[in-house]
Design a protein with these regions (language model features):
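Beta1/beta-strand and adjacent pyrophosphate-binding region of the FAD-binding site
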Residues: 1-15
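Conserved N-terminal Rossmann-fold NAD(P)-binding element of oxidoreductases
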Residues: 10-11, 33, 111
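Glycine-rich FAD pyrophosphate-binding loop
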Residues: 25-43
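Short beta-strand to alpha-helix junction loop
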Residues: 51-70
């Protein structure tokens, strides 16, 4: 597995994918890490494999997410899904992937971890 990159991006949601696309357009080597198996983040989760019914139900914004995921997948950026970043140091990201630890070296590290769903317990919410 390659371990030296110009940029390591943590998070494959809309911000992480967009940053990766911009960086690759400038000829930089890019590794995008995400704990989920597929890119898209919380908002475009499973955008690349959504059924026609789901796309119709969710609407036009989801279609834009599908286009972003498709462009990201076709880019020269490397995506490593199922990766857990457990430590950061200047120029280094310590990552566990499929039971093995790796040290990814980068000139820059971008943290784009995005949003997380969180239920807000209100009286009668269940």
């Amino acid at each position: 597995m390659r371990t030296q990159w110009d940029i390591v991006i943590i998070g494959a949601g809309p911000a992480g994918m967009s940053a990766a696309l911009q960086a690759t357009r400038h000829g930089l080597s890019v590794l995008v890490l995400d704990r989920q198996a597929e890119p898209g983040g919380q908002i475009f989760r499973s955008a690349g494999s959504a059924s026609a019914d789901k796309r119709k139900q969710i609407g036009a914004d989801y279609a834009r997410g599908e286009a972003l995921v498709r462009e990201f997948r076709q880019s020269p950026a490397t995506f490593l899904g199922g990766a857990n970043v457990w430590h950061l140091a200047p120029g280094r990201a310590y990552v566990s992937h499929q039971g093995t630890s790796h040290v990814m070296q980068a000139r820059q590290i971008l943290i784009a971890t995005g949003a997380m769903e969180r239920p807000v317990p209100l009286p009668g919410w269940t």
